[in-house]
């Protein structure tokens, strides 16, 4: 079935869905379950996309376009049914058709599991970028891994995070197409055998290696309101040998499937626990598996229409989303030199023109460094290649800085010392054409700190592309009421040019418009409150401030500071110290399985919630929610109902953030530090329409030299009281020592994320929030200004900048 937009109507849509019920899931409308109907609808939509998908890919070949390959360990897609229908322009028609057939569309949507392909902002950014690349008709492909169990399902048991498998593929993925014809070998371990060929070239061959196969699965990515459909290709690891029948026949059932299990482990879960050596090894194998299969596929596609590799760098641009795929640089060199027999200099020239690197962090633990022992064991040939890259690179460094060993050390890809490491960020800089940060502040920071020495060598390599979000999912899809109001008052152009939102700013002075705006927020809050009660059993007041802190749990994101503030307000209520504006504080986010402190912070939040929510003196003045298993589909419910967006990272540690943009797009006001994209948001929205507080990055750098957290407690009895309550087991009577690591972190381990340094300013700013919330007309004006000023932060704008300033690509001519 090919989708013809001009011929589709409710009746033809009903017929198409029923055909899939009968022929696709082999049920009758009477016997089909809700899941069957969801699958039938999804398969119908997939068939509607097929013609555009094929036409798009054909146009790339016909026009011999330069293609973009976006490689990422994460793609946090969320659910696809509503998003695909919205982009195809069929959402309302499908809803009507299903209603006529007697089905509830919202129930069908709930049948779809969020795709288990990501965890945090890195993956969600990649997903927004895929949407924008298709909408802008950029010839692009996403490449990632098809994880069997995602990162994990988060459950809360007795306040603790408990990880369980994310069974997102239990019922299959109706959006994927298995491409069995694209099966690539990927090799690990072994040893390198060198010989001289007839032309006198050194030939490297990996022998005695372990071979794993990469199987391709394609997921369509439709653009908004056009016929373009790009591809996200995901790799699944499979054993070369498969089921060992001889072992099975002799009763050795475990050995019979051992190879299948070991190979499959590579794509079993996202980010295996790297606090153990086995987890580190598996992570390295994951990253190499991704880039090896991807680059083999890129070369296959290129050589399909080109007889030589002369134009490879003119037709291919690869974007590395963080350092995880940086091994692709060494893999491209291996394939070009070892397999294609190019001279080293020719191969290196092509490679450094093809690859580009997006840096997402300056946090030391997130900048990948692989021990030489592990690297040489898993990827011996690639270590040789990296040594050669480094030797040639350091020769250039020595030419520019003769005798400067400190400069050589700083710029080396290999870190010397008692233990040696491969520095993947340095490899990513040396082996790429452009390096970009993801906010103006972050880009300045990496140039002045992390890559300062590289900037001296490559002054033109480093640029900025501020992150963005897709307004299709984060407004039109998730906040139908607000988008309908905007459509009616300022038109729909903002969906493809978000700067048109500025047209709403004059309406902030219209009292009738403000009332409509306010009523939409209240309705969204009432719906969320009902869901909180249904799923979590907690009654919250929709008239309270909905104060939301939903993101990955990490010390630098300072969920700890937020819960300390909650304890402060709890004490204020208990002591009767003045009027408190009713507040509902909502937390959500996952902690990495091996990150003990982050998991303990989750426990503290839940224990504080248990005390606060059950204290009759508090009543409805303060409620604390930790919503388990935070994910895209949950964010789509929380963000439209939020009044206050928590963006309170330690200044200098958040590269950009995109949650801040999503909240502002939905009319929430931001409380935040001058960090990441908050700084640019303040410029575009107006600092007066946000609640900015806290130390600046340069102030933190100075304070770090002589920071004494205990002195803050000595000077502020209120803060000391909060820590005493934690230390004295007010929130942990089952285990009086439970939260001592948190108190120690703050007082005895230097408070590395400056929680106590910013806490008083944070509390004072929260008091300003409460004062403004008591003035609904003024609050609503600022809410409108937030939406009107957020237009710069579209992923369409981000992708247009990548296309122009990094990739040098444009849409096909036909």
Swiss-Prot record:
Keyword Transmembrane helix carried by entry: no
EC number annotated for this UniProt entry: 2.4.1.1
Cellular component GO terms held in the UniProt record: cytoplasm
Swiss-Prot/TrEMBL keywords: Allosteric enzyme, Carbohydrate metabolism, Glycogen metabolism, Glycosyltransferase, Pyridoxal phosphate, Transferase
Pfam families xrefs: Phosphorylase (PF00343)
Cofactor dependence: pyridoxal 5'-phosphate
GO molecular function: glycogen phosphorylase activity; pyridoxal phosphate binding
Cystine bridges: none
A GO BP annotation: glycogen catabolic process
InterPro entries attached to this UniProt entry: Glycg_phsphrylas, Glyco_trans_35, Pyridoxal_P_attach_site
Top EC class of this enzyme: transferase
N6-(pyridoxal phosphate)lysine sites (modified residues): 662
Catalysis performed (reactions): [(1->4)-alpha-D-glucosyl](n) + phosphate = [(1->4)-alpha-D-glucosyl](n-1) + alpha-D-glucose 1-phosphate
The family this protein is said to belong to: Belongs to the glycogen phosphorylase family.
Function text: Phosphorylase is an important allosteric enzyme in carbohydrate metabolism. Enzymes from different sources differ in their regulatory mechanisms and in their natural substrates. However, all known phosphorylases share catalytic and structural properties.
Protein name: Glycogen phosphorylase
Species the sequence originates in: Chlamydia trachomatis serovar D (strain ATCC VR-885 / DSM 19411 / UW-3/Cx)
């Amino acid at each position: 079935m090919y989708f013809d937009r001009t011929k589709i109507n409710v009746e033809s849509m009903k017929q198409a869905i029923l055909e899939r019920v009968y022929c696709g899931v082999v049920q009758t409308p009477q016997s089909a379950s809700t899941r069957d109907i969801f699958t039938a609808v999804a398969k119908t939509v997939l068939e509607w996309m097929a013609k555009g998908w094929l036409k798009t890919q054909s146009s790339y070949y016909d026009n011999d376009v330069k293609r973009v390959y976006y490689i990422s360990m994460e793609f946090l897609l969320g659910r696809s049914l509503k998003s695909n229908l919205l982009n195809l322009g069929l959402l309302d028609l499908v809803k009507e058709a299903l209603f006529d057939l007697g089905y509830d569309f919202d129930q069908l949507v709930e049948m779809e599991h969020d795709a288990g392909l990501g965890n945090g902002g890195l993956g969600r950014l990649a997903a927004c970028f895929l949407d924008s690349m298709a909408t802008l008709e950029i010839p692009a492909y996403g490449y990632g891994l098809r994880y069997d169990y995602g990162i994990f399902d988060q459950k809360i048991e007795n306040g603790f995070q408990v990880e369980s498998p994310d069974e997102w593929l239990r019922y299959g993925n109706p959006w994927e197409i298995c491409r069995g014809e694209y099966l690539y070998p990927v090799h690990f371990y072994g040893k390198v055998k060198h010989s001289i060929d007839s032309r006198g070239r050194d030939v490297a061959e990996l022998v005695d290696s372990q071979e794993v196969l990469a199987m391709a699965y394609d997921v369509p990515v439709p653009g908004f309101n056009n016929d373009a459909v790009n591809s996200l290709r995901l790799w699944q690891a499979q054993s070369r040998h498969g089921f060992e029948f001889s072992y099975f026949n002799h009763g050795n059932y475990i050995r019979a499937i051992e190879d299948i299990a070991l190979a499959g482990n590579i794509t079993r879960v996202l980010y295996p626990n790297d606090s153990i050596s086995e987890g580190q090894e598996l992570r390295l194998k994951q990253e190499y598996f991704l880039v090896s299969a991807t680059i083999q596929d890129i070369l296959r596609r290129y050589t399909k229409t080109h007889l030589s590799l002369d134009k490879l760098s003119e037709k291919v641009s690869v974007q590395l989303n963080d350092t995880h795929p940086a091994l692709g640089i060494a893999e491209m060199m291996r394939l070009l030199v070892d397999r294609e027999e190019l001279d080293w200099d020719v191969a290196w020239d092509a490679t450094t023109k093809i690859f580009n690197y997006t840096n997402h962090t300056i946090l030391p633990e997130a900048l990948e460094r692989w021990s030489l022992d592990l690297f040489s064991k898993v990827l011996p040939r690639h270590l040789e290649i990296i040594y050669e890259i480094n030797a040639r690179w350091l020769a250039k460094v020595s030419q520019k800085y003769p005798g400067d060993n400190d400069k050589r050390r700083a710029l080396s890809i290999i870190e010397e010392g008692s233990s040696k490491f491969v520095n993947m960020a340095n490899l990513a800089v040396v082996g790429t054409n452009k390096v970009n940060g993801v906010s103006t502040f972050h880009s300045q920071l990496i140039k002045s700190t992390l890559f300062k020495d590289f900037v001296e060598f490559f002054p033109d390599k480093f640029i900025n592309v501020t992150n963005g979000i897709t307004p299709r999912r984060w407004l039109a899809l998730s906040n139908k009421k607000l988008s309908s109001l905007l459509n009616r008052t300022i038109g729909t152009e903002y969906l493809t040019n978000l700067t048109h939102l500025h047209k709403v700013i004059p309406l902030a002075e219209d009292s009738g418009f403000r009332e409509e705006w306010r009523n939409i927020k209240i309705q969204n809050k009432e719906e969320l409150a009902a869901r909180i009660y249904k799923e979590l059993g907690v009654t919250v007041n929709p008239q309270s401030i909905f104060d939301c802190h939903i993101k990955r749990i990490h010390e630098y994101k300072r969920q700890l500071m937020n819960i300390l503030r909650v304890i402060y307000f709890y004490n204020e209520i208990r002591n009767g110290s003045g009027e408190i504006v009713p507040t509902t504080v909502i937390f959500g986010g996952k902690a990495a399985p091996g990150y003990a402190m982050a998991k303990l912070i989750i426990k503290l939040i839940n224990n504080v919630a248990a005390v606060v929510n059950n204290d009759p003196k508090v009543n409805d003045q303060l409620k604390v929610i930790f919503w388990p298993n935070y994910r895209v589909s949950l964010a789509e419910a929380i963000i439209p109902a939020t009044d206050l967006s928590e963006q309170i990272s330690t200044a200098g540690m958040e590269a950009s953030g995109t949650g801040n943009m999503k909240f502002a797009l939905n009319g929430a006001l931001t409380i935040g530090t001058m960090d990441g994209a908050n700084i640019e948001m303040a410029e575009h929205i107006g600092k007066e329409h946000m609640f900015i507080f806290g130390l600046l990055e340069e102030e933190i750098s100075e304070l770090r030299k002589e920071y004494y957290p205990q002195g803050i407690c000595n000077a502020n009895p209120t803060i000391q009281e909060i820590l005493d309550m934690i230390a004295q087991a007010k929130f942990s009577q089952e285990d009086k020592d439970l939260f001592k690591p948190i108190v120690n972190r703050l007082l005895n381990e230097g408070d590395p994320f400056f929680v106590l340094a910013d806490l008083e300013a944070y509390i004072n700013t929260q008091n300003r929030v409460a004062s403004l919330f008591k003035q609904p007309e003024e609050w609503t004006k600022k809410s409108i200004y937030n939406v009107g000023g957020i237009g710069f932060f579209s992923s369409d704008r981000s992708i247009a900048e990548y296309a122009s300033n990094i990739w040098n690509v444009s849409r096909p001519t036909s």
